[in-house]
From Swiss-Prot:
It catalyses: shikimate + ATP = 3-phosphoshikimate + ADP + H(+). The lineage of its organism: Archaea, Methanobacteriati, Methanobacteriota, Thermococci, Thermococcales. This is Shikimate kinase. Pathway: Metabolic intermediate biosynthesis; chorismate biosynthesis; chorismate from D-erythrose 4-phosphate and phosphoenolpyruvate: step 5/7. It comes from Pyrococcus furiosus (strain ATCC 43587 / DSM 3638 / JCM 8422 / Vc1). Keywords: Amino-acid biosynthesis, Aromatic amino acid biosynthesis, ATP-binding, Cytoplasm, Kinase, Nucleotide-binding, Transferase.
Length: 273
């Protein structure tokens, strides 16, 4: 029995670290998982932009969660191909979890509603230790697309807003920041300000929300201000994705942003979905 699943990257509108409530927008960068059900053996590979990635925590956690959910003891042969950079704030873990849960569900012929696929993926991400809040906002945006606003503590989708297909430029610095590295940071210090950003997002003013969120978190986490500053000067809507270090810009002139960001790291041009 075989199955195929997909999950996309996403960009942050409001980071849930400070308040437990967050929002993200799906973008057109993908992770694909192919699985074959076996009698018990677990083997496979993860490729990120063609390079082998040897952290299998999310895979093992998804397998545990799906065994328990289905009541079936099984193994898998898997191949995961991703075009989402890891440790850059671009929801790579959410995309892998969604893709793998969906692939296993299809292989086992389980009819699971989309929101349950997402919740199983979030459970696995928590189990794997790759999220501080459960990242339900990221997981919803990865699975459903559009803007998803959530209460991550209650695992509740509060609002989903369709987003037009808009050009997105992503700056991917060389630095990698893993979520587990932030466990000692007291994000409550910025909670009152992040709460205001979330209120804007719920009202539909998500562009204002993501700029405010980006300024708050990038300053609090001491990221260099130049990339955001340069993009704001060009009239772009600019934010920090997740915990960073990736910065993104929504703009009608992606080539201009790409030009000024090249000195800071790799640049990807994609779109919202």
């Amino acid at each position: 029995m075989r199955g195929l699943g997909k999950g996309s990257s996403a960009i942050t509108v409001v980071n849930a670290f400070a308040t437990g409530k967050g929002g993200a927008i799906g973008i057109d960068l993908w992770t694909e998982a192919k699985v074959k059900i076996t009698d018990g053996e677990v083997k496979g590979k993860i490729l990120v932009n063609g390079l082998e990635f040897n952290d299998f925590r999310v895979v093992n956690a998804v397998l545990d969660v799906m065994r328990r959910y289905s009541g079936i003891e099984f193994g898998i042969e898997f191949e995961i191909n991703s075009e989402i950079p890891v440790g850059k704030g671009l929801k790579s873990s959410s995309a892998v979890a969604n893709a793998l849960v969906e692939a296993i569900a299809r292989a086992l012929r389980l009819n699971i509603p989309g929101i349950k696929v997402v919740k199983l993926g979030v459970e696995a991400a928590k189990k794997a230790g790759v999220t501080l809040t459960g990242a339900f906002d990221d997981a919803c945006a990865s699975y459903f697309g559009g803007l998803c606003l959530t209460d991550n503590l209650r695992v509740e989708l509060l609002k989903r807003i369709e987003i037009d297909e808009l050009p997105v430029v992503i700056l991917v610095p060389n630095e990698t920041v893993l979520t587990e590295e932030l466990k000692g940071v007291d994000f409550l210090k910025i909670a009152p300000y992040v709460e205001e950003a979330f209120k804007l997002a719920i009202k539909g003013e998500w562009k204002k929300a993501l700029v405010l969120n980006g300024l708050i978190y990038s300053t609090f986490l001491s990221y260099p201000p130049e990339p955001i500053s340069k993009a704001l000067h060009l009239g772009a809507v600019v934010g920090l994705s997740g915990k960073g270090p990736s910065v993104f810009a929504i703009t009608d002139e992606p080539e201009r942003i790409e030009e000024v960001w090249r000195e800071f790291g790799d640049v990807i041009i994609t779109s919202t979905r």
